[in-house]
């Protein structure tokens, strides 16, 4: 394989640039040429493809976001979009692709491989919701950013004797809420993976003020449960009479310089992706499990360790869907009592 390409797709995540840098420099060391694809699959279809060299990826290791930019492009799920993208890849002499992104990005990598273009997926999302890996690129940075914000919110919460509901990103996964909540000493953490009783939430707030002689209360809410304002309204309906405020950390969690951990795992995965393509291997996703690099087929059977399967109707289903660590949820309950 003489020329490969790299793209970032879906929501941006700190560490994506580190992965791109590793792909480029590892490929060059292996005597391969590398192209960057701007704006993910949209840029592939439109032919927004350009050569990359070592100088082009210098000074991006510590930058947040993705210098290749990203875009959601649902049209690539259709055969017409895939064929247009493949036409552009052939036009630029590209023989393999490294795809950095989430579930939807993996589906695109799977389709490319089916059409004869080996593609390797790297888990790039702050949500940490990709199957086949303990950690995704960007998750550690997002947790650090959220924890820093929660520490600051606790300061003002204490100063004014208030209850705060802090909504954090994560899509349908509660990992960011859980990890940052424990790190910040949250009084309650509400995540999609674990049911909650709003009356119990309110009772915990009241008990915290009364029995613990605390003058403030911090609740971390994963966006996959509901929005913060809606949750606060439920609390008021259930009898909460505290001085309640709502804060949504929003997209701040996607930005900022990646942590050393995110830089290292992104570099590790990016370099390994090149090794797989050099061997002509595609249709694989790289992950980290028990601090070791692992590879899983993107499409296949659950028994074979594949991340996704196809139903008889041709629908893509997730094998062994990701779940937040509920033992961590139990830990938080023990520590907040």
Curated annotation (Swiss-Prot):
Substrate binds at residues 125-127, 162, 169-171, 223, 245, 251-254. Keywords: Allosteric enzyme, ATP-binding, Cytoplasm, Glycolysis, Kinase, Magnesium, Metal-binding, Nucleotide-binding, Transferase. One of its GO terms (cellular component) is 6-phosphofructokinase complex. One of its GO terms (biological process) is fructose 1,6-bisphosphate metabolic process. Its EC number is 2.7.1.11. ATP binds at residues 11, 72-73, 102-105. One of its GO terms (molecular function) is monosaccharide binding. InterPro entries: ATP_PFK, ATP_PFK_prok-type, PFKA_ATP_prok, Phosphofructokinase_CS, Phosphofructokinase_dom, PKF_sf. Catalyzes the phosphorylation of D-fructose 6-phosphate to fructose 1,6-bisphosphate by ATP, the first committing step of glycolysis. Belongs to the phosphofructokinase type A (PFKA) family. ATP-dependent PFK group I subfamily. Prokaryotic clade 'B1' sub-subfamily. This is ATP-dependent 6-phosphofructokinase. The lineage of its organism: Bacteria, Bacillati, Bacillota, Bacilli, Lactobacillales.
